[in-house]
Amino acid sequence: MFESKKALVFCPKFFSYDVEIKKAIENQGYDVELHDERPSTNIFIRALIRLGYNDILKKKIESYYLKIFNTLTEPVDFLIIISPECITPEILKKFREKCSNIVVYMWDSFKNKPQALDLISCSDAFYTFDSNDAELYDIKLKPL
């Protein structure tokens, strides 16, 4: 019997872009599970993340992602991460056990989210909206 394709998406909640992205992927024939890329919407935690203090939140971040990982009962065709701030290479490697393709898209510059550079080597495809970042880091340009 035909099985639908599955996508797991981590995207910041931002002016409902996450919901629109989910709809667009569903329109491509995927069952989509959507999660916020950040483990909390608490303003203090979001500020720590934005300022790059992820080490302080390491246990919270790992716990958040592992909880989601442990709920996956079937293989996932695509893990899509949009504008990552929290997810680490170690977490991506864990998800690789259940996700056959890992795709990352940056809608922000690496100047603002330098930790995302560590994800390039862990991804099957890595895209950016920033032409300077695309050239500097030899990644694919995909404007907004």
Predicted segments, located by residue:
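Short helix-terminating capping/connector loops at secondary-structure junctions
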Residues: 2-3, 74
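Extended catalytic core of nucleotide-activated donor transferases of GT-like folds
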Residues: 10, 19-21, 28, 33-138
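Nucleotide-activated donor-dependent transferases that construct or modify glycoconjugates
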Residues: 3-13
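Short beta-strand->alpha-helix junction loop in the catalytic core
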Residues: 143-144
